Amino acid sequence: YVFHAAAYKHVSILEENIFEAVENNFYGTKNLVDIATERNIERFCFVSTDKAVNPKTIMGCSKRLAELYIQSVYNDLSEKKLTCPKFSIVRFGNVFNSSGSVIPLFNQQISMGGPVTVTSKDVERYFMSITEAVNLILQSTELSNDCSIFVLDMGSPIKIIDLARRLIRLSGLSEKNNENPEGDIEIKITDSIDHCFLYDNDGPKIVSTSPWTGNHEVSAATEEFSVVLD
């Protein structure tokens, strides 16, 4: 089995590093898929992102392109009646307390006396636990027989500013603001996020989609990308 979870995932950084995003998130995936196909790997699970739904960011686009390549390979091999790994694609939301997520960052800022920095008072994100993420990977890997995309029901989105306030309270401290000027930790709004990044893409949550049945334009696009990156 192959579980492919490696990727560049920081949205703001990838907006300024487009080639690196495509080279790592797309071509890194392509290389693994090609090797898995050549070596007759039984199952291949690709960890994607909910930002691949109607992608508005470079990160989302790079992951969506990787999804399309996997589906293109599956369709091509299936049409030719050739041996093919059983591909599955899982779209993650934000994983609570994972490396690089906001929770370790906020906890670090709180431990240093603040401020806790939030990009916008309106920004919202869907979250899932580490256990939910692991179960999604394992179950989708076993269930998929046709390169389906699996998405976990993550409930309602959480406002990041509310999450910051909860973490401050859980630390036994209080928020410092106009209503409580003697509080312990200030929340600073940086206003450093584009409006289109405020909300995670909303779509059906715990579903398995039908496999993509498009044509072979992905292969042509891949070759064009190769020329540009070289």
Where are these regions (language model features)?
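Short, solvent-exposed loop/linker segments at the N-terminal edge
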Residues: T213-T222
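Mid/C-terminal beta-alpha module of Rossmann-like enzyme folds, strongest
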Residues: L143-D194, N201
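Rossmann-like NAD(H)/NADP(H) cofactor-binding core
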Residues: K86-R91, V95
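Proline/serine/threonine-rich low-complexity linkers at boundaries of modular beta-sandwich domains
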Residues: C196-S210
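A short glycine/threonine-centered beta-strand motif
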Residues: T222-D230
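Conserved Rossmann-fold NAD(P)-dependent oxidoreductase catalytic core, especially the SDR/UDP-sugar
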Residues: H4, Y8-L68, S72, S78
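A conserved pocket-lining segment of Rossmann-fold NAD(P)-dependent short-chain dehydrogenase/reductase
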Residues: L82, L105-M128, E132, L136-I160, ...
